[in-house]
């Protein structure tokens, strides 16, 4: 809280200032301890899937390979088990809600990226980073708040903007073994892979059921 004393004629007034941030957008984060023990298995899983279906599908991917979607939990393997272990332990979702989802593999080679998009017909979406070389692309979310002009954002101090994350967009650095889960309506994209290696990840959509 901020306050100041101002003089008004022969009187003094105390002015108090405070603010409240409303309508926050939660971004959930899971970090897998000991990810190095399963990383190579997940990499092999991704490339094996690509060998079985080299065409894949085209969605937001620009030049990259994307697998066709598969139901999470339908197979008893390292990928399905990893996703289920993370999502079944969601501490901020009521136990009365069930989670059903589908996932797909992403392989972005040098120069590939994912264009701006959102995920309709689902409640939550997410990504698990498997193999992330340096400078291979990061995820950027576009603010759902409709600022009429850039002037409002620029008028705030940098400290205030950073403290309350008031920006047009927000980047998350990709880290191997980390999973992000976010509201499906959030527009986002993945920047270009500027490394000399493949970038591997698993994306997914979740529907919440009561």
Describe the residue ranges of each PLM region.
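Ligand-binding loop in jelly-roll beta-barrel domains
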Residues: 187, 191-201
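Histidine-centered metal-chelating micro-motifs
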Residues: 112-113, 185-189
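Short histidine-centered beta-strand/loop micro-motifs
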Residues: 95, 114-119, 191-194
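Catalytic core of non-heme Fe(II) oxygenases with the double-stranded beta-helix
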Residues: 105-181, 198, 208
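Short peripheral tails and domain-boundary helices/loops at the edges of structured domains
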Residues: 202-210
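Non-heme Fe(II)/2-oxoglutarate
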Residues: 13-96, 106, 113
